[in-house]
UniProtKB/Swiss-Prot annotation:
Disulfide bond annotation, renumbered to this chain: C24-C42, C35-C59, C63-C74, C75-C80
Native species: Naja atra (Chinese cobra)
Protein name as catalogued: Cytotoxin 1
Keyword flag Disulfide bond: yes
Keywords noted in UniProt: Cardiotoxin, Cytolysis, Disulfide bond, Hemolysis, Membrane, Myotoxin, Secreted, Signal, Target cell membrane, Target membrane, Toxin
Known role: Basic protein that binds to cell membrane and depolarizes cardiomyocytes. It also shows lytic activities on many other cells, including red blood cells. Interaction with sulfatides in the cell membrane induces pore formation and cell internalization and is responsible for cytotoxicity in cardiomyocytes. It targets the mitochondrial membrane and induces mitochondrial swelling and fragmentation. It binds to the integrin alpha-V/beta-3 (ITGAV/ITGB3) with a moderate affinity and inhibits protein kinases C. It also binds with high affinity to heparin.
């Protein structure tokens, strides 16, 4: 009985992923990656000349400021970029 209970606890821990991990899209939205510790934002980077097609996506710790050439869009939920 103790073995069964221990097995259930281990399976629950593995399935629930007790440490929350953020998943962000890569450049191709079909593919995603799990962000490392400390990188708690997803981002999309656009060139200001064409705001319809992102040129880079991934995980980041702080959302960068926009510049004259580049615009960043950041968010904090799974695959939001």
């Amino acid at each position: 009985m103790k073995t069964l209970l221990l097995t259930l606890v281990v399976v629950t821990i593995v399935c629930l992923d007790l440490g929350y991990t953020l998943k962000c899209n890569k450049l191709i939205p079909i593919a995603s990656k799990t962000c490392p510790a400390g990188k708690n934002l997803c981002y999309k980077m656009f060139m200001m000349s064409d705001l319809t097609i992102p040129v880079k996506r991934g995980c980041i710790d702080v959302c960068p400021k926009n510049s004259l050439l580049v615009k960043y869009v950041c968010c904090n939920t799974d695959r939001c970029n």
